[in-house]
Swiss-Prot record:
It comes from Mesocricetus auratus (Golden hamster). It comes from the Eukaryota. SUPFAM superfamilies: Family A G protein-coupled receptor-like. It is a multi-pass membrane protein. GO terms for molecular function: adenylate cyclase binding; amyloid-beta binding; beta2-adrenergic receptor activity; norepinephrine binding; potassium channel regulator activity; protein homodimerization activity; protein-containing complex binding. The gene is ADRB2. The lineage of its organism: Eukaryota, Metazoa, Chordata, Craniata, Vertebrata. This is Beta-2 adrenergic receptor. A lipid is attached at C265, C341 (S-palmitoyl cysteine).
Length: 418
C-alpha cells in the first residue's frame, strides 16, 4: 500500500451491494449509513474550520508570524487540503460502497492523500530540526534560519512530497500485477489502492519512517537539553531564595534578573511541550496505519479490512486535532478569541498584534503572562528590560522567543515557536 493510503484495497466491496434478507437488517444498514455520514461530516467540518482558523490567525497577527509558525502554517495547509479534497471522497467511498468519480480522479485523489501525509510528517521533522538549532545555537538562531530560508525549506518539503506522491502514482509505478488489481484499475467504480510490494515498502520508508526516526532522535535531544536547563533553573532559584538574607541583598538586581530569566525559560518549555504533543499525536494517529501498510504487502490476508479502514480514518482525524492542541499556546488562544469575536477589543486595533483587553490595558497578542501597563512591583514584572547576557546564559538551550511589553520593549531576544 502507498504510505498515507486511501480507503484502499480494504475498502468496502465495490462489486455489488448487499441485499438484506429482512426489513430489520435494511433499517439497521440505513441507520448505520446515516450515523456514519453525520460523524464523517463532523470530522470534515472540524478539519476545515480549525485549520482555516489557524492559517487566518497567523496571517492576521504579526505576533504569530515567526519562523516556526511558518512551518505550522504549512502543516495547517496540508491538513486543510486533507479536509477539503481527501476525507470527503473517502467518506463517499465508504458510504456508497463504490467509487463514483472515475479512474482519473481516483488516482489524483490518491496522490493528494499521499502528498498531504508526506508533507505533514516532513514538516514536523523540519520543526524538530528548527527547535534543535534554536537550542544548540540560541544566539545564532535568527541568522541561521531566517524567514526567507524557512519559506525555501517549506517549498522543498512540498516538492519532495509531490515527487513522492504524484510521480510514482501518475506514472503507474505503484501498480500491482495480479488479476484482481488489474481488474480494479480498469473499472470506473473501483478505487482500491492495490500496490506492488516494492512501492509499498519504499514509499512508507521514505515518506514516514525515515522522517519519523529523524524527528524522534532530534526531539529527544531537544528534551534532554531542556531537562538540563530546568535543573539549572531549579538550582538558580534555590540560591535566590536562600535563607541568608545578606546574600539576597548582595545579589540585588542580579537575583531579579535571574528570576525573570527563569520565568522566560519556563514559558518556552511549555511551548516546547506543545510542539511535542503535536508530534506525538501525529505519530500515534498514523503509525498504526503504516505498520499495517507494511504487514499487508507481506501477508495480505492477515489484517481485516475493517481494521484497515479504522486505522486509516484515525490518521484522517489527526488533521482536526492540531488546532485544538494550539489552544495550549496563549498566543493562539487569544488570536482565536479575537477572530471568533469571543474577546473584547477596543475600537482601535493594530495590525502588529496589539489589542486592548476588557480592563482597558494594552496586551501584546499572546502574552498572557502580564506584559501590560500597570503599577506593579519591580520584582514581579516580566516585561521590563530583556534578560542580560549573564542571566540569559542560564536559559541557553531553551527555545528562544520574541515578546514585547505594552511599551514595545523586548522581554526576550529571539523567535517564538508557538
Amino acid at each position: 500500500m502507498g504510505p498515507p493510503g486511501n480507503d484502499s484495497d480494504f475498502l468496502l466491496t465495490t462489486n455489488g451491494s448487499h441485499v438484506p434478507d429482512h426489513d430489520v437488517t435494511e433499517e439497521r444498514d440505513e441507520a448505520w449509513v446515516v450515523g456514519m455520514a453525520i460523524l464523517m461530516s463532523v470530522i470534515v467540518l472540524a478539519i476545515v474550520f480549525g485549520n482555516v482558523l489557524v492559517i487566518t490567525a497567523i496571517a492576521k497577527f504579526e505576533r504569530l508570524q515567526t519562523v516556526t509558525n511558518y512551518f505550522i502554517t504549512s502543516l495547517a495547509c496540508a491538513d486543510l487540503v486533507m479536509g477539503l479534497a481527501v476525507v470527503p471522497f473517502g467518506a463517499s467511498h465508504i458510504l456508497m460502497k463504490m467509487w463514483n468519480f472515475g479512474n482519473f480522479w481516483c488516482e489524483f485523489w490518491t496522490s493528494i492523500d499521499v502528498l498531504c501525509v508526506t508533507a505533514s510528517i516532513e514538516t514536523l521533522c523540519v520543526i524538530a530540526v528548527d527547535r534543535y538549532i534554536a537550542i544548540t545555537s540560541p544566539f545564532k538562531y535568527q541568522s541561521l534560519l531566517t524567514k526567507n530560508k524557512a519559506r525555501m525549506v517549506i517549498l522543498m518539503v512540498w516538492i519532495v512530497s509531490g515527487l513522492t506522491s504524484f510521480l510514482p502514482i501518475q506514472m503507474h509505478w505503484y501498480r500491482a500485477t495480479h488479476q484482481k488489481a488489474i481488474d480494479c484499475y480498469h473499472k470506473e467504480t473501483c478505487c482500491d489502492f492495490f500496490t506492488n510490494q516494492a512501492y509499498a515498502i519504499a514509499s512508507s520508508i521514505v515518506s514516514f519512517y525515515v522522517p519519523l526516526v529523524v524527528m524522534v532522535f532530534v526531539y529527544s535531544r531537544v528534551f534532554q537539553v531542556a531537562k538540563r536547563q530546568l535543573q539549572k533553573i531549579d538550582k538558580s532559584e534555590g540560591r535566590f531564595h536562600s535563607p541568608n538574607l545578606g546574600q539576597v541583598e548582595q545579589d540585588g538586581r542580579s537575583g531579579h534578573g535571574l528570576r525573570r530569566s527563569s520565568k522566560f525559560c519556563l514559558k518556552e518549555h511549555k511551548a516546547l511541550k506543545t510542539l511535542g504533543i503535536i508530534m506525538g499525536t501525529f505519530t500515534l494517529c498514523w503509525l498504526p496505519f503504516f505498520i499495517v501498510n507494511i504487514v499487508h504487502v507481506i501477508q495480505d490476508n492477515l489484517i481485516p479490512k475493517e481494521v484497515y479502514i479504522l486505522l486509516n480514518w484515525l490518521g484522517y482525524v489527526n488533521s482536526a486535532f492540531n488546532p485544538l492542541i494550539y489552544c495550549r499556546s496563549p498566543d493562539f488562544r487569544i488570536a482565536f478569541q479575537e477572530l471568533l469575536c469571543l474577546r473584547r477589543s477596543s475600537s482601535k486595533a493594530y495590525g502588529n498584534g496589539y489589542s486592548s483587553n476588557s480592563n482597558g490595558k494594552t496586551d501584546y497578542m499572546g502574552e498572557a503572562s502580564g506584559c501590560q501597563l500597570g503599577q506593579e512591583k519591580e520584582s514581579e514584572r516580566l516585561c521590563e528590560d530583556p534578560p542580560g547576557t549573564e542571566s540569559f546564559v542560564n536559559c541557553q538551550g531553551t527555545v528562544p522567543s520574541l515578546s514585547l511589553d505594552s511599551q514595545g520593549r523586548n522581554c526576550s531576544t529571539n523567535d517564538s515557536p508557538l
